[in-house]
From Swiss-Prot:
The gene is atpD. Has multiple subunits with at least A(3), B(3), C, D, E, F, H, I and proteolipid K(x). The keyword Cell inner membrane does not apply. The keyword Cell membrane applies. It comes from the Archaea. Pfam families: ATP-synt_D (PF01813). It is a peripheral membrane protein. GO terms for cellular component: plasma membrane. This is A-type ATP synthase subunit D. Component of the A-type ATP synthase that produces ATP from ADP in the presence of a proton gradient across the membrane. Keywords: ATP synthesis, Cell membrane, Hydrogen ion transport, Ion transport, Membrane, Transport. It is found in: Cell membrane.
Length: 214
């Protein structure tokens, strides 16, 4: 017989197990629904991440081309001096949000694109090519932060999907079948005991009737 639980083969245990099977099957159904919903959410975000990554690659290319043109116009040494004098960006704030019980990051990205006057370098010593390059890299930074949020969300959702899948499989292939096998075993055991009791009572009745007829 397949593997069973170590319980006493009594009617009380039989009733308990039947209740446990119902609860386990309900839990399995809910977990399966959660798993399916998580997978749908994962692929929705995955498509978004792919689109953002393609856009980021494009923007990085544009930014480095703008940087090359700025170098040609003002020279590498002057460009480095300008870069050192740039004001730092605003700080980002990382919070979290809930997606079907999974905590994922929520990054509050401030407006990173700035006016030339907000960057901190003197107009007289720079050029429009430098402004364009700075703007392009600000766009890259903003998109990279958004992509980091999305990819971390994917990572956490993926872990939760695997965790939920293991629980679904454990219930479906181990726990519920084991309980059902145990129920079957107890029912067979109780039926056998009833048959033995029936034949025992029948023999006792026959003996009593034989004595009365003597």
């Amino acid at each position: 017989m397949p593997e069973i639980l170590k319980v006493k083969p009594t009617r009380m245990e039989l009733l308990k197990l039947k209740r446990r099977v119902k609860l386990a099957e309900r839990g399995h159904k809910l977990l399966k629904e959660k798993q399916d919903a998580l997978i749908m959410e994962f692929f929705t975000i995955y498509d978004e991440a792919l689109s953002m990554r393609r856009e980021l690659i494009k923007k990085i290319g544009e930014a480095f081309e703008a940087l090359r043109l700025a170098q040609v116009e003002v020279g590498s040494v002057r460009l480095k001096e300008i870069a050192i004098g740039v004001n730092p960006n605003k700080e980002i704030e990382v919070r979290s949000r809930n997606i079907m019980g999974v905590r994922v990051p929520l990054i509050e990205v401030p407006e990173l694109k700035r006016k030339p006057s907000e960057r901190g370098y003197a107009f007289i010593s720079t050029s429009s090519a430098v402004d364009v390059a700075a703007e392009k890299f600000e766009e890259v930074l903003e998109l990279a932060i958004r992509l980091a949020e999305v990819e971390e969300s994917l990572k956490r959702l993926g872990k939760e999907i695997e965790k939920t899948k293991r629980r679904v499989n454990a219930l479906e292939y181990i726990i519920i079948p084991r309980m059902k096998n145990t129920i079957k075993f107890i029912e067979q055991h109780l039926d056998e005991m009833e048959r033995e009791n029936f034949f025992r009572l029948k023999r006792i009745k026959a003996l009593l009737e034989a004595r009365e007829s003597m």
